[in-house]
């Protein structure tokens, strides 16, 4: 029991220091963070919790539950950087807890429970998303909860089994309310083959309908309400966000079928070189129900997502919890047997590559500086690379003693990296910091204009105003701009002179422009030259 308290305290400390502490110390990244911050803020201010709007325009790409939780964070902690990101951090923290609980349920081995949670929360991809405001950490939580509850359900009896199936239904419902039908597809393609293999299909047919009914009950009130408020919602959401993205020739974010294979390796850094021993042991134990379930959970969603034409890196987040458990199982078995070779190789290779990265940074900085008069940023970058090198080197030198140290390097990375980035990156990717520096002047403007959706949403969130006029840009807002009741929210090139003249006659005009591409420079040239810049 003492070791469990110690392990829990260590994981909680890591959560507080690595996940929560950095949330409020760097600007919102475009396009995701500014988008989700603004949509959820608009829900808070407008009171419309049914149909999502992005800068006052209909935005039907996702259901509202993810926005609700981000809005809750802003309501409780303030409309600030911490409030925008807290939902992602807590969602990831709860997924870490689920990894710990599932490992305990499967193996009843405190060391494997701790290793499962530690590996999962130090996977670079998981840790990075914990401090990033988007919907994937929330969706991953609901998917993880669905499958963990399923495992509890099929290993329980009587009332405990009914409670577990109820949790399956609630989690499926909330997953659907966060990202749509994928929340039902992923559990189905895992649980059905597993129960068939276990020859327990009758049990699934007996209790599965309970979860289905509860999931529908969770979703139905909102589904009916949004249909009444926005009759076109379901057509757009189903066909555009599901069918076209999955199978359309012009699918958004199109990638080749093998896209997720190298990404899976990168996602589990700094533990990637443990994958060979992980898969070797998993294959040897594939006839065991627990290993088979975890393999199905890892492989089948990965295959399903690979079939989709549209792919984003964060889609594989639900595959990482079972990978962490399989890896923890192999790692602890190696530790128990005194076999440190895989850990030694992992540590040495990580340390060597990071040290080479440190040398490359120094060389580039001397030849063609990446950091221009930014000694603190450069120092932090050196600290990050040095810390990663040392923690992994110690694992390589004494793998059986310092096996967990790469996790410290991973957490150091996510704490310091945002503050270690060059100003060129920060200014380009976090425009809300520029808006914050000029907030007083911009807040006094009657009209606001931008040629970039990321900058526009940052401006909208900082000033708590959805009425930003979009100059020659539309992108993901093309659908929302097509409604007749929002005409005038967009200005094309040929109409900018008339718009500026009219806007100036009504008060001050604030403009945030991006000027890197030839098209953007042309847009800048069309603006009046007599304005303050």
Swiss-Prot record:
Membrane topology, from the record: Multi-pass membrane protein
Protein's UniProt keywords contain Transferase: yes
Domain of life: Bacteria
Pfam name, any one: PMT
Single Gene Ontology BP annotation: lipopolysaccharide biosynthetic process
Annotated GO CC locations: plasma membrane
Residues that span the membrane, as ranges: 10-30, 64-84, 86-106, 113-133, 137-157, 170-190, 207-227, 257-277, 290-310, 312-332, 345-365, 377-397, 402-422
Molecular-function GO term, any one: mannosyltransferase activity
Pathway the protein contributes to: Lipopolysaccharide metabolism; 4-amino-4-deoxy-beta-L-arabinose-lipid A biosynthesis
InterPro entries according to UniProt: ArnT_tfrase, Glyco_trans_39/83, LipidA_mod_glycosyltrf_83
Location in or out of the cell: Cell inner membrane
Keywords tagged on the record: Cell inner membrane, Cell membrane, Glycosyltransferase, Lipid A biosynthesis, Lipid biosynthesis, Lipid metabolism, Lipopolysaccharide biosynthesis, Membrane, Transferase, Transmembrane, Transmembrane helix
Catalyzed reaction equations: 4-amino-4-deoxy-alpha-L-arabinopyranosyl di-trans,octa-cis-undecaprenyl phosphate + lipid IVA = lipid IIA + di-trans,octa-cis-undecaprenyl phosphate
Enzyme Commission number(s) of this protein: 2.4.2.43
Key word Transmembrane present: yes
Residue stretches in coiled coil: none
Protein family (similarity comment): Belongs to the glycosyltransferase 83 family.
NCBIfam families assigned: PRK13279.1
PANTHER family noted in UniProt: MANNOSYLTRANSFERASE YKCB-RELATED, UNDECAPRENYL PHOSPHATE-ALPHA-4-AMINO-4-DEOXY-L-ARABINOSE ARABINOSYL TRANSFERASE
Function as written in the Swiss-Prot or TrEMBL entry: Catalyzes the transfer of the L-Ara4N moiety of the glycolipid undecaprenyl phosphate-alpha-L-Ara4N to lipid A. The modified arabinose is attached to lipid A and is required for resistance to polymyxin and cationic antimicrobial peptides.
Name of the molecule in the record: Undecaprenyl phosphate-alpha-4-amino-4-deoxy-L-arabinose arabinosyl transferase
Source organism of the structure: Pseudomonas savastanoi pv. phaseolicola (strain 1448A / Race 6)
Gene behind the chain: arnT
């Amino acid at each position: 029991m003492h070791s469990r308290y110690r392990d829990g305290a260590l994981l909680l400390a890591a959560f507080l220091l690595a996940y929560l502490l950095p949330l409020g110390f760097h600007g919102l990244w475009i396009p995701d963070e500014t988008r989700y911050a603004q949509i959820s803020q608009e829900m808070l201010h407008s009171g419309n919790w049914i149909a999502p709007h992005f800068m006052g325009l209909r935005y039907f790409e996702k259901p509202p539950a993810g926005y609700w939780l981000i809005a809750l964070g802003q309501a409780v902690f303030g409309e600030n950087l911490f409030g925008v990101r807290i939902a992602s951090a807590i969602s990831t923290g709860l997924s870490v807890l689920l990894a710990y609980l599932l490992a305990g349920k499967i193996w009843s081995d405190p060391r494997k429970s701790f290793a499962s949670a530690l590996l999962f929360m130090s996977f670079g991809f998981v840790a990075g998303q914990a401090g990033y405001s988007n919907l994937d950490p929330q969706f991953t939580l609901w998917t993880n909860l669905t499958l963990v509850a399923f495992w509890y359900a099929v290993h329980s009896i009587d009332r405990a089994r009914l409670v577990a199936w109820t949790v399956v239904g609630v989690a499926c419902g909330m997953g659907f309310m966060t990202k749509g039908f994928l929340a039902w597809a992923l559990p189905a393609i895992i649980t059905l083959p597993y129960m068939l293999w276990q020859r327990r299909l009758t049990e699934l047919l007996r209790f599965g309908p309970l979860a289905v009914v509860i999931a529908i009950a969770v979703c139905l009130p909102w589904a009916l309400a949004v249909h009444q408020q926005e009759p076109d919602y379901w057509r757009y959401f189903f066909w555009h966000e599901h069918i076209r993205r999955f199978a359309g020739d012009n699918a958004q974010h199109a990638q080749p079928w093998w896209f997720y294979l190298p990404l899976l390796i990168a996602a589990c850094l700094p533990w990637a070189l443990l994958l060979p021993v992980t898969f070797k042991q998993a294959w040897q134990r594939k006839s065991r129900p627990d290993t088979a379930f975890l393999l199905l959970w890892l492989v089948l969603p990965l295959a399903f997502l690979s079939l989709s034409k549209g792919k984003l890196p964060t889609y594989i987040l639900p595959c990482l919890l079972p990978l962490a458990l399989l890896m923890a199982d192999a790692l602890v078995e190696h530790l128990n047997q005194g076999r440190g070779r895989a850990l030694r190789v992992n540590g040495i290779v990580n340390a060597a590559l990071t040290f080479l990265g440190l040398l490359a940074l120094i060389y580039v900085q001397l030849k063609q500086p990446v950091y221009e008069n930014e000694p603190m940023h450069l120092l932090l970058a050196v600290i990050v690379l040095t810390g990663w090198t040392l923690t992994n080197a110690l694992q390589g030198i004494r793998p059986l003693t310092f096996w967990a140290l790469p996790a410290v390097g991973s957490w150091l990375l996510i704490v310091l990296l945002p503050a270690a980035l060059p100003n060129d990156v920060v200014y380009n990717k976090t425009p809300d910091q520029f808006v914050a520096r000029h907030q007083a002047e911009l807040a006094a403007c009657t009209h606001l204009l931008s040629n970039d959706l990321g900058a526009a949403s940052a401006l909208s969130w900082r000033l708590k105003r959805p009425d930003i006029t979009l100059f020659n840009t539309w992108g993901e807002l093309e659908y929302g701009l097509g409604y007749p009741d929002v005409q005038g929210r967009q200005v094309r090139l040929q109409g900018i002179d008339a718009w500026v003249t009219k806007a100036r006659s009504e008060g001050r005009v604030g403009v945030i422009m991006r000027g890197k591409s030839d098209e953007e420079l042309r847009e800048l040239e069309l603006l009046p030259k007599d304005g303050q810049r």
